[in-house]
C-alpha cells in the first residue's frame, strides 16, 4: 500500500502569469487544461497557501458561469436513502459506515450496531416514503459477502475461494438476497431507483466471467433507473492505494460507468476530497470525469463531497488530522463548475456542509442543493453533524432567502416544479403520489399530513 507521505505536490507554474492566464481562460469560457485547473484551485502555484483576493476572483467567475448555464434556479429532489446493509469487508480507511461482515454471521455472538434489510423490508420502507410524496430512493450499501447479482451468480460463487469474497446466505442472521431482488423490490414500491455504484457493480460480477454490461443490463431489467457515480473518491490510483486499497482501480470505475451508460442508465459523478490527496490529484480527477462525459454524454450532475474525518480510520490512525478548509471547499465547487464544461449541474451537499455553508456554496458555482433525505447513515456514521432530513418548506425558505428560485426536480432533472415559498402549505409535487402535502420525517414525530412542512 502506498504511504500517504509519498504523495508530493511538485507542480510549478509555467510562467509568472499562470494564474492570470488560467483565470482569463475561465472567464472567456475556453476549455481549461489540467494546468489551468491546478492554478485556479490553488489560487496560483507561485504562492504558498490560498490567496484570498485571487480566491474571490475564481468564485466570481464560477458564479457567473453557473448563472449563464443554469440561471438562478436551485434544485433539489424529494428522496429517501435506503441503505440495505452495513456489512462490508472492503476496509476503506475513509469510511465508518461499514461493519465487518463476520459480525453478521449467525455464529458470531457479540452485538454490533449494523443492519441488513430483506427485499421485503426495503420495499416497505420505500413504499411508505413514496406514499408520503418522495420521488427517488437512493440505495448505496456495504459489499455484503452473501450479495450476488442474482441467484445464478450466487450459485456460481465458491465460498472456499477467498477471491470470491462469498459466504452463503445461511451463514448470516439476515439474507440480503441479491442486487436484482433488492432493486426489484424498491422499483415495485413505485420509486425512481438510483442505485448500484461502480463498486457495487464490481461486487456483482466477482468470480464470474461476465462484465459490467451484463450487470447493469440485468439490473435495468429489474427496475434500476439511474446509477450514482460514487465510490470514485479520488480517481488517481496512487491515492486510492492509500485510502481504499481494496477497491476497484480508476480504469475499472470508468469502465463500469461506461457500461451503465451503454445500458441506458443515467449517471451522476462525485469526488471525495480533503484527505491525503493534493490539488493536482483533484484536478486530474476532474479531468477523468470530463473525458468520461465527452464520451458518454450521460452524467447529469457532479457532486463534490468534502471528507468528514471524525470517526474514520484515516483520522484515528493519524494519517490525516482534519478535512478540507472552508476555502478549499469553495474552490472545489468553483473549479468543478469551471473545469467541467460538459456537466450542467454542480451540487452543494447540506449533509456534508450544513445549511449555512451549503447555501454559501450555491454562490460559488453550485446550483443543486441535494435532497430531502428521509434517512441518512453514511455521513452520520463518519461523524457528520448536520442531520438527516430537510423538508420542502425548509428548502423553499433557505433558497429564497439567498435570492434564488427553489425548484423540486426529478433525479434526471427532466421534471421540475417551482416552489412558491409564500404558499400556505409547501410539499413535494414530482413523486407519483406527491400532491403538495407537506413532507415530514418520521423522526420529527409529526403526522405525515400535518401542516407546516
From Swiss-Prot:
> Which UniProt key words apply to this protein?
4Fe-4S, Iron, Iron-sulfur, Metal-binding, S-adenosyl-L-methionine, Transferase
Q: Could you tell me which PROSITE patterns the record lists for this protein?
A: RADICAL_SAM
Manner of cofactor binding, per the entry note: Binds 1 [4Fe-4S] cluster. The cluster is coordinated with 3 cysteines and an exchangeable S-adenosyl-L-methionine.
Q: What is one Pfam family matched by this protein?
A: Radical_SAM
Q: Which residues form the Radical SAM core domain?
A: 74-344
Q: Where is this region: Disordered?
A: 418-453
Documented EC number(s): 2.5.1.147
Question: What EC class is this?
Answer: transferase
Transmembrane segments annotated in the record for this chain: none
At the top level, the lineage of the source is Archaea
**What GO molecular function annotations does the UniProt record carry, in alphabetical order?**
4 iron, 4 sulfur cluster binding; 5-amino-6-(D-ribitylamino)uracil--L-tyrosine 4-hydroxyphenyl transferase activity; 7,8-didemethyl-8-hydroxy-5-deazariboflavin synthase activity; metal ion binding
Q: Where is [4Fe-4S] cluster annotated to bind?
A: 88, 92, 95
Q: Self-association or partners: how does it assemble?
A: Consists of two subunits, CofG and CofH.
What family does the entry list?
A: Belongs to the radical SAM superfamily. CofH family.
Q: What does this protein do?
A: Catalyzes the radical-mediated synthesis of 5-amino-5-(4-hydroxybenzyl)-6-(D-ribitylimino)-5,6-dihydrouracil from 5-amino-6-(D-ribitylamino)uracil and L-tyrosine.
Protein name per the record: 5-amino-6-(D-ribitylamino)uracil--L-tyrosine 4-hydroxyphenyl transferase
Q: Please tell me the species this chain comes from.
A: Halobacterium salinarum (strain ATCC 700922 / JCM 11081 / NRC-1)
Q: What is the lineage of its organism?
A: Archaea, Methanobacteriati, Methanobacteriota, Stenosarchaea group, Halobacteria
* Gene name for this UniProt entry: cofH
Amino acid at each position: 500500500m502506498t504511504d500517504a507521505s509519498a504523495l508530493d505536490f511538485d507542480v510549478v507554474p509555467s510562467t509568472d502569469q499562470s494564474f492570470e492566464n488560467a483565470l482569463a481562460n475561465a472567464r472567456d469560457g475556453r476549455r481549461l487544461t489540467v494546468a489551468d485547473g491546478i492554478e485556479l484551485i490553488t489560487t496560483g502555484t507561485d504562492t504558498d497557501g490560498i490567496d484570498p483576493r485571487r480566491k474571490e476572483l475564481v468564485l466570481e467567475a464560477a458564479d457567473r458561469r453557473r448563472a449563464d448555464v443554469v440561471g438562478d434556479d436551485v434544485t433539489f429532489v424529494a428522496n429517501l436513502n435506503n441503505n440495505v446493509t452495513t456489512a462490508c469487508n472492503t476496509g476503506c480507511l475513509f469510511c465508518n459506515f461499514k461493519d465487518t461482515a463476520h459480525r453478521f454471521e449467525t455464529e458470531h455472538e457479540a452485538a454490533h450496531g449494523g443492519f441488513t434489510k430483506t427485499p421485503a423490508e426495503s420495499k416497505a420502507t420505500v413504499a411508505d416514503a413514496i406514499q408520503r410524496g418522495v420521488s427517488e430512493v437512493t440505495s448505496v450499501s456495504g459489499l455484503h459477502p452473501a450479495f450476488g447479482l442474482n441467484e445464478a451468480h450466487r450459485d456460481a460463487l465458491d465460498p472456499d475461494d477467498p477471491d470470491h469474497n462469498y459466504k452463503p446466505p445461511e451463514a448470516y442472521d439476515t439474507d440480503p438476497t441479491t442486487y436484482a431482488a433488492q432493486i426489484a423490490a424498491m422499483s415495485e414500491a413505485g420509486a425512481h431507483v438510483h442505485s448500484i455504484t461502480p463498486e457495487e457493480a464490481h461486487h456483482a460480477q466477482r468470480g464470474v466471467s461476465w462484465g459490467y454490461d451484463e450487470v447493469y443490463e440485468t439490473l435495468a431489467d429489474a427496475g434500476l433507473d439511474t446509477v450514482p457515480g460514487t465510490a470514485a473518491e479520488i480517481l488517481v490510483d496512487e491515492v486510492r492505494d492509500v485510502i481504499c486499497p481494496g477497491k476497484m482501480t480508476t480504469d475499472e470505475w470508468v469502465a463500469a460507468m461506461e457500461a451503465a451508460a451503454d445500458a441506458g442508465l443515467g449517471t451522476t459523478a462525485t469526488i471525495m476530497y480533503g484527505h491525503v490527496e493534493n490539488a493536482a490529484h483533484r484536478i486530474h480527477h476532474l479531468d477523468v470525469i470530463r473525458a468520461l462525459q465527452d464520451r458518454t454524454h450521460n452524467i447529469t450532475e457532479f457532486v463534490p463531497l468534502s471528507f468528514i474525518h471524525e470517526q474514520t480510520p484515516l483520522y484515528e490512525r493519524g494519517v490525516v488530522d482534519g478535512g478540507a478548509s472552508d476555502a478549499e471547499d469553495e474552490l472545489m465547487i468553483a473549479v468543478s463548475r469551471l473545469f467541467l464544461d460538459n456537466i450542467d449541474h454542480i451540487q452543494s451537499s447540506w449533509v456534508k456542509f450544513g445549511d449555512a455553508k451549503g447555501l454559501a456554496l450555491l454562490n460559488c458555482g453550485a446550483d443543486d442543493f441535494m435532497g430531502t433525505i428521509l434517512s441518512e447513515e453514511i455521513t452520520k456514521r463518519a461523524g457528520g453533524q448536520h442531520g438527516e432530513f430537510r423538508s420542502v418548506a425548509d428548502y423553499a425558505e433557505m433558497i429564497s432567502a439567498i435570492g434564488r428560485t427553489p425548484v423540486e426536480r426529478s433525479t434526471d432533472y427532466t421534471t421540475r416544479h417551482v416552489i412558491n415559498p409564500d404558499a400556505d402549505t409547501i410539499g413535494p409535487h414530482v413523486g407519483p403520489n406527491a400532491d403538495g402535502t407537506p413532507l415530514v420525517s418520521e423522526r420529527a414525530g409529526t403526522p405525515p399530513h400535518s401542516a407546516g412542512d
